[in-house]
Regions:
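Acidic, glycine/GT-rich loop-and beta-edge segments that sit at the periphery of enzyme/chaperone cores
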Residues: 22-33, 218-223, 544-553, 562-564, ...
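Glycine-rich phosphate-binding loops at beta-strand->alpha-helix junctions
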Residues: 458, 463-479, 762-781
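Glycine-rich phosphate-binding loop of actin/hexokinase-like ATP-binding domains
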Residues: 260-301, 524-528, 533-627, 862-863
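Conserved phosphate-binding/catalytic loops in two-lobed NTP-binding clefts
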Residues: 489-524, 528, 782-818
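Phosphate-binding glycine-rich/basic clefts of nucleotide- and phosphate-handling proteins
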Residues: 281-377, 381-384, 584-721, 832-906
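Early-domain small/polar-rich strand-loop-helix modules and first-structured segments
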Residues: 1-398, 611, 615-618, 623-627, ...
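Phosphate/oxyanion-binding active-site loops and adjacent basic polyanion-contact surfaces
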Residues: 222-232, 353-357, 419-443, 473-480, ...
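Phosphate/ATP-binding catalytic cores across multiple sugar-kinase/actin-like superfamilies
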Residues: 234-253, 427-456, 530-563, 713-761, ...
Length: 990
């Protein structure tokens, strides 16, 4: 028996089954059909019949008089009245093999009669609830088969919403169905006569018929879809596939918290319980749970490791189009999917004049402009985003869209948008909505509640903790905060009781705005990694003896809070997917307290937009694509360089829109996986090896669209090759070359960071983020001699101990997780849930912007030459030149022009119309732009106060023609994962 709690949204129950191909999969059920024709011989109506053998005849079971059915539901043959029965011609009777039923309904959501039981053998079920349960059934993948010793899985979905409707149609559970003891029970009805009202509904008929027609061409047996359905239920019931269900009341609650480290490439989450029925309970880290993301298309697949931030618009109905008839049930209002499901949906989407997927919304927090192309939903049945028959785009105007404006912001007018031209920044809100729905489903899942104890208590989300990159711009911090608040608002609109009425988003104790001069975000990623290290050392390894930790790890320093006591200065280099962050903090303990309070003092912080995804791109450009070139030339192909540049380079004038779609798919579905394999190679091998692309894709998922045939066709045609098999291409996994590619992108960053680490006399260097696992990166830090190797700690090799939520026997394979764990520790300390560790983060609120110097970025978008500086440190006005082309303006922290800069603004014409308008005026280039920055916000340039004069000194009315666009993405308006463009060189000839 499984207990669900009322009003906890859609709840999933998984039932593993082991069904061998040799199994009989038999059902004793047999069927016949009655078709009624009109006077013209046209089919008018019909029904499915259930033959019962009586004497030498077969009769329809439903025609047997009630007196001939005993209290157990069995037939009393001698009581059958011949004047009631309907005789069935034996030749019309048929059976359905179990394998056929499996093949028809596998991989589909179908309705399921899970009715309330009653203590009456002749009528063992109430007539409902009808619409609260759906089932998905299918074969599991090989990994799951080995892990769980199962071949198939049933996934039951229950909509636990209850209503006050004792007298009406019994469609949803009533309030009275939920009890504190769970003594009201629900079971799946298998015998057809007990759920005739259920399956005879026209919408159920359409639902099942639509699925059947996808798999089978009907030649006869008009109601065979029903026969398959009944046989499927019978066989799964024989396999004990349908547990008994109880519904508990929702009056007892436990508060939970959600900790999120939202990355450009991946996101990591933890769920914790912050209250307990038992008073004065301290927190046990082993009780925290990893956030799970369920694949709603393949619902038995649940991922609890850090998940991809790829997003794809998709509507989940838990059924086919016929399920639209069922109103106000199974509402999953999220607009998009994330993680592995989004990656898979991206692989089947091909549309030339619309969009449905994006690599990461966090990269586009700066872009609040309305999209020129509409967002449409991916057709999850594989029809490439369009209705198969009508070629009709399905706009993303479902679910939470009723509360949105056209640009994706929350509507205050009450009128929903009719167009899905959402800004790219708004997709951050949509992604957070999906994450919240996934978390809310997880915390009330029966397995979660059973694991945590107090399983009869409803879990309610009270706290959300969010981290951010250490050097994230102030505006992006504001935008991220607004996205979180909008997501919470949208979830509350749909499920008002799912979130605590006093829900808090941390670390925002107070409202923040663009006018704030200090950064509000205490939970920065690099500092959180340091907190994880401190907790592990002080509590786990030094057993709470804080003074010993500082004695053995630190030293006495003059300029500290307590000069007479040891302090530890820790540097963290966090190499994520999109940014590399440095945080140098000095830590001391205030020993006056019974439990020493750790006080971090930030010393230096910095962040660069160069990280793991840039490493992947460089490996593709230095290793993967040159292997393509070499292979094609060995096959005696001609025009190889031109062909590869056409396929994988920048946009060219002779390329169709479909080509650019395939180029993006190649980047994400082929090249990226090949780069991952190269990274795996250098982590595990020193010997050079060659592998075909076919060998690589024995591990990674093959593209399911037309990408491979398209590439093969272009290469055969342009390279004049009679035959070409894409999967035969040899990739040269040369260890030295792969490491060279990694170092080429990351060494300039390491060189700058190690100088600072040496200047600030650090005691420990922590390397966090998944890319820090690369041996070449640690080697670069060791070669700098800034610290002895024993003081350089790579979290990928660090022994945390069994307390760590993501540890496997104390080891952590993915350093990405240290950020969310550190944020959890800091949060628990702030609410006094830790008995051996306290940390005061107040000093971190003084971390301000690193935008000391603003200037025009160089051509490679990574440096600002001194001659191109606009505003220097402690200065508030400057000039730059405009020659008619967009000007990229960036920021850096230090006075050296070799210091890596970050993109901040683009100065350009408002649009082509205003450019043409100005061209009609009598002005000459170059223009000189004088601009000021806000004295209270170092990042803010004031376009309203700019002065523009042309070459001859004539003043131009700038506000009429120009805009200053806040933009943190360098080099174009799209990230390489979103446009698929690579820099190609003829490496094989060098």
């Amino acid at each position: 028996m499984i207990e669900l709690i009322q009003n906890t949204g859609i709840q999933f129950i998984e039932i593993p089954l082991k069904i061998n191909e040799d199994d009989n999969l038999s059902s004793e059920k047999s069927f016949a059909e009655e078709i009624i024709y009109d006077e013209n011989g046209k089919e008018e109506s019909g029904s499915i019949l259930f033959p019962y053998k009586w004497n030498d005849s077969y009769v329809d079971f439903d025609s047997i008089n009630a007196e001939a059915i005993d209290r157990n539901g069995d037939v009393i043959p001698e009581e059958i009245r011949e004047d009631f029965i309907k005789i069935i011609d034996k030749s019309n009777i048929y059976k359905v093999r179990g394998r056929e039923a499996f093949d028809v309904y596998t991989g589909h959501w179908i309705p399921l009669p899970y009715f309330r039981t009653r203590n009456d053998r002749s009528k063992p079920f109430h007539s409902g609830p009808h619409d609260w349960c759906r089932m998905w059934f299918g074969e599991v993948d090989l990994e799951t088969q080995k892990k769980e010793n199962s071949t198939h899985k049933i996934v039951l979905a229950f909509d636990t919403d209850t209503i006050d409707n004792e007298q009406g149609n019994y469609l949803k559970p009533n309030h009275s169905d939920a009890t504190s003891s769970g003594n009201t029970r629900f079971k799946c009805v298998i015998k057809e006569r007990f759920f005739t009202d259920f399956y005879s509904r026209a919408e159920i008929d359409s639902w099942l018929s639509n699925i059947y027609d996808l798999k089978v061409n009907r030649s006869k047996n008009y109601f065979r879809h029903y026969a398959n359905y009944f046989v499927l239920l019978d066989i799964l019931d024989q396999a004990n596939g349908f547990p008994e269900i109880a519904l508990l009341t929702d009056d007892k609650t436990i508060e939970t918290g959600l900790v999120l480290d939202i990355g450009n490439s991946r996101t990591c989450g933890l769920i914790v319980e912050t209250t307990s029925p038992k008073p004065n309970t301290t927190f046990d880290f082993t009780s925290s749970k990893k956030l799970q993301i369920r694949d709603l298309s393949i619902p038995y697949q649940v991922n609890e490791e850090p998940f991809e931030m790829q997003v794809a618009f998709a509507e989940e109905k838990f059924g086919n189009e016929a399920s639209d008839y069922f109103s106000d049930v199974f509402q999953w209002p999220s607009l998009l999917r994330i993680g592995k499901e989004a990656v898979r949906l991206t692989s089947i989407f091909e549309s030339e004049d619309s969009q449905a997927t994006m690599s990461s919304p966090k990269r586009y927090l700066w872009d609040y402009s309305e999209s020129s192309l509409p967002w449409i939903k991916v057709d999850k049945d594989g029809y490439i985003g369009y209705n198969q028959h009508e070629n009709l785009r399905k706009a993303a105007l479902f679910g939470i869209a009723e509360y949105l404006n056209t640009d994706g912001t929350v509507s205050k007018s009450g009128f929903p948008t009719t167009e899905s031209n959402y800004s790219r920044a708004s997709l951050m809100t949509f992604a957070l909505v999906e994450i919240l729905y996934q978390a809310l489903t997880q915390i009330n899942n029966h397995s979660y509640r059973k694991d945590m104890g107090n399983s009869s208590f409803r879990r309610i989300l009270k706290n959300i903790v969010i981290t951010c990159p250490t050097a994230m711009t102030a505006k992006e911090q504001i935008y991220l905060k607004e996205s979180i608040e909008a997501a919470v608002f949208l979830v509350k609109k749909q499920y008002p009781n799912s979130l605590h009425q006093e829900l808090k988003i941390h670390p925002f104790e107070n409202e923040i705005s663009f006018e704030d001069s200090e950064k509000p975000w205490k939970y920065d990623e690099a500092t959180c990694s340091q907190i994880t290290y401190l907790y592990s050392e002080m509590v786990d390894k030094f057993k709470g003896r804080h003074e010993l930790f500082f004695k053995y790890k630190g030293k006495k320093r003059k300029n500290t809070l307590f000069p007479s006591k040891e302090s530890v200065t820790i540097a963290t280099v966090d190499i994520g997917g999109g940014t590399t962050d440095l945080m140098i903090c000095n830590y001391q303990a205030d020993a006056e307290s019974e439990i020493p309070i750790i006080k971090p003092i930030p010393v230096f912080w910095e962040g660069f937009n160069v990280a793991g995804d840039d490493i992947v791109k460089r490996i593709i450009e230095f290793v993967i694509l040159p292997s393509f070139e070499k292979y094609l030339k060995e096959q005696e192909g001609i025009n190889v360089d031109e062909t590869l540049n056409y396929l994988f380079g920048s946009n060219l004038g002779n390329q169709a829109a479909t080509h650019r779609i395939y180029r993006k798919q190649f980047a994400n579905q082929i090249a990226t996986y090949c780069a991952y394999e190269a990274i795996n190679h250098v982590n595990t091998n020193s010997v050079n090896r060659k592998k075909t692309i076919g060998d690589v894709f024995k591990i990674y998922p093959k593209p399911k669209n037309n990408l491979i045939p398209y590439i093969e066709d272009v290469i055969k045609r342009k390279c004049h090759l009679a035959t070409f098999n894409f999967f035969d291409v040899l990739i040269d996994f040369h260890t030295e070359l792969i490491n060279y590619a990694i170092a080429d992108i990351i060494k300039p960053v390491v060189d700058q960071l190690t100088k600072l680490i040496g200047v600030f006399d650090c005691d420990v260097l922590l390397l966090s983020g998944k890319s820090s696992n690369l041996a070449i990166i640690r080697e670069l830090f060791e070669k700098s001699l800034v610290l002895s190797p024993d003081k350089i700690i790579n979290f990928g090799n660090y022994k945390f101990g069994d307390w760590y939520p993501f540890a496997n026997f104390g080891e952590v394979k993915d350093p990405k997780t240290t950020v969310s764990v550190g944020a959890l520790i800091a949060f628990l300390s702030s609410i006094n849930k830790l008995d051996k560790f306290r940390i005061d983060l107040n000093q971190l609120s003084g971390i301000q912007s690193t935008a000391e110097y603003l200037g025009v970025l160089s051509d490679n978008f990574s440096r600002i030459k001194d001659s191109k500086l606009i505003v220097e440190k402690n200065k508030f006005e400057g000039k730059f030149m405009f020659f008619g082309a967009p000007v990229s303006i960036g920021m850096r922290q230090l006075p050296s022009e070799d210091w890596i800069a970050s993109s901040l603004y683009v100065f350009n014409f408002i649009d082509d119309y205003h450019k043409d308008l100005l061209a009609k005026e009598d002005f000459e280039y170059p223009f000189t732009i004088t601009i000021s920055r806000d004295e209270d916000d170092k990042e803010e340039l004031l376009i309203d106060e700019m002065v523009i004069v042309d070459k001859n000194g004539y003043e131009v009315e700038g506000e009429n023609y120009f805009k200053l666009l806040f933009k943190t993405l360098p080099n174009g308006l799209e990230y390489w994962k979103d446009n698929g463009s690579f820099l190609l060189k003829n490496f094989s000839d060098e």
